[in-house]
């Protein structure tokens, strides 16, 4: 009885740990992703003038941001690519990057951020 309880506990702990399963393990193991060069995310939006910032977020300087629209559908393809990507130039907010004038986006969503407004950077207070 004690042996089966111990086996159940070990299986439970194994299930709760962060494992690298065969279908989602990057080449070289879990830590290999940290060594890869980060590529620019896929183009999206009208004329491919935007970049993906999340699975349903497409932003561009000339376009603004499309969230959950047909223009952002291509961004779902990022989920199937093996290497990480990054869009935007300047970091902002909590783990986000400047996506368009005055807008900061992370994979979870977008919000207004004065740090991303190029005109605010040059204005005098």
Swiss-Prot record:
Residues bearing the modification Glycine amide: 28
Annotated GO MF terms: neurohypophyseal hormone activity; neuropeptide hormone activity; oxytocin receptor binding; V1A vasopressin receptor binding
SMART domains for this protein: NH
GO CC, one annotated term: secretory granule
Keywords assigned: Amidation, Cleavage on pair of basic residues, Disulfide bond, Hormone, Secreted, Signal
Protein localization: Secreted
Pfam families (UniProt xref): Hormone_4, Hormone_5
Record's signal peptide: 1-19
One Gene Ontology term from the biological process aspect of the record: response to estrogen
Disulfide bonds: 20-25, 41-85, 44-58, 52-75, 59-65, 92-104, 98-116, 105-110
InterPro entries: Neurhyp_horm, Neurhyp_horm_dom_sf, Neurohypophysial_hormone_CS
Subunit-structure text: Interacts with oxytocin receptor (Ki=1.5 nM). Interacts with vasopressin V1aR/AVPR1A (Ki=37 nM), V1bR/AVPR1B (Ki=222 nM), and V2R/AVPR2 receptors (Ki=823 nM).
Function: Neurophysin 1 specifically binds oxytocin. Oxytocin causes contraction of the smooth muscle of the uterus and of the mammary gland. Acts by binding to oxytocin receptor (OXTR).
Similarity annotation: Belongs to the vasopressin/oxytocin family.
The protein's name in its UniProt record: Oxytocin-neurophysin 1
Organism: Bos taurus
């Amino acid at each position: 009885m004690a042996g089966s309880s111990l086996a159940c506990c070990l299986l439970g702990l194994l299930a709760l740990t962060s494992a690298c399963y065969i279908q989602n393990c990057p080449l070289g193991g879990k830590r290999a992703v940290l060594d890869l060069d980060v590529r620019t995310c896929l183009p999206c939006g009208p004329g491919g003038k935007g970049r993906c910032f999340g699975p349903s977020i497409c932003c561009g300087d000339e376009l603004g941001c499309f969230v959950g629209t047909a223009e952002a559908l291509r961004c779902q393809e990022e989920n199937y690519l093996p290497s990480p990507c990054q869009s935007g130039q300047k970091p902002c907010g909590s783990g986000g990057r400047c996506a368009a004038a005055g807008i900061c986006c992370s994979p979870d969503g977008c919000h207004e951020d004065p740090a991303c407004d190029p005109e605010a950077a040059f204005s005098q207070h």
